[in-house]
Amino acid sequence: MRYLTAGESHGLSLTAIIEGIPAGLTLHPADIDHELQRRQGGYGRGTRMSIETDRVQISSGVRHGKTTGAPITLTVINKDHQKWLDVMAVGDIEETLKLKRRVKHPRPGHADLVGGIKYHFNDLRDALERSSARETTMRVAVGAVAKRILAELGIDMLHHILIFGGITITIPSKLSFRELQERALHSELSIVNPKQEEEIKTYIDKIKKEGDTIGGIIETIVQGVPAGLGSYVQWDKKLDAKLAQAVLSINAFKGVEFGVGFDMGFQKGSQVMDEITWTPTQGYGRQTNHLGGFEGGMTTGQPLVVKGVMKPIPTLYKPLMSVDIDSHEPYKATVERSDPTALPAAGVIMENVVATVLAKEILETFSSTTMSELQKAFSDYRAYVKQF
């Protein structure tokens, strides 16, 4: 399984092409639209989300509600493009129009300046448009297809926010996976403690008035993954490493942890390692899950626990100082539309990116041309792991 995305933030559309999806997977536009709507939700989103109502068009690889095994083409139209016809025109236009929305004051924290240097852009909009988080629309669309595969194999997942702009979410003890999932899904903030909703919303409103932004830490949990996915035989086969790369590829993500993560640096080995158990009904298990479901780059059969830290959005309504790329004089950075926070949306993106990596790993491990073949191979492997 592999995919490519294409498109700009204010271009005509965003596109993804996915190759390697087995034939026979039930897939409807509504499956993808559901995830796209989740990405557009959450408290603290800006005006762009009120302009766009993302809906996917499937133009290949699916017939009568089933995948055919051919490449799948997904497209989302940018409604906002109508206001940017001159600025984002494919053909050449008058010089005066080119200057209309030219970006020459790069924003600290964005790809503007370095992208302009790398690709020799005189107008930094060419870097801004492609590096925008709008591209994650298609990462979510691809992830929605991946989640359909995982669901057919009995794998489920959730995400929730652990730290919201410096406020630590108090997680009620002994919540089951399903309870965590339900609480996060029904929260505008993707948190599992409803008692903290108003405090955080008030803080977001305050940050918005200040023209500032906040980041935080997101946790994704995956349930139902058997032991043995990934490999220790080569560095690039380790599944946790693949997940780390994928999570860090999400806009504004700057760090990844598994299990208790960086807290391991403060603990002894006897406190960190997960003791092994065995029962006739469940097979091998662990007393704890400090390592987040990974040992030696492979899954252990425990829930996968992946955490990602998202920096505050770098586009500020009270912009920081920058430099004019023509005169090299100090100027305030360009201001584009922005949100005080996009943590709930980033959680949806992270969840779908993790789903894509897992689906790809499963398809590589259990090579199958049809879903029925994949389901049988996966079921047989589960049975083998249980009786080992």
From Swiss-Prot:
Cofactor entry: FMNH2
Residues annotated for FMN binding in this entry: 130-132, 251-252, 296, 311-315, 337
Entry keyword set: Amino-acid biosynthesis, Aromatic amino acid biosynthesis, FAD, Flavoprotein, FMN, Lyase, NADP
Pathway the protein contributes to: Metabolic intermediate biosynthesis; chorismate biosynthesis; chorismate from D-erythrose 4-phosphate and phosphoenolpyruvate: step 7/7
Cofactor note: Reduced FMN (FMNH(2)).
Similarity section: Belongs to the chorismate synthase family.
Described purpose of this protein according to its UniProt entry: This reaction introduces a second double bond into the aromatic ring system.
Protein name: Chorismate synthase
Lineage: Bacteria, Bacillati, Bacillota, Bacilli, Lactobacillales
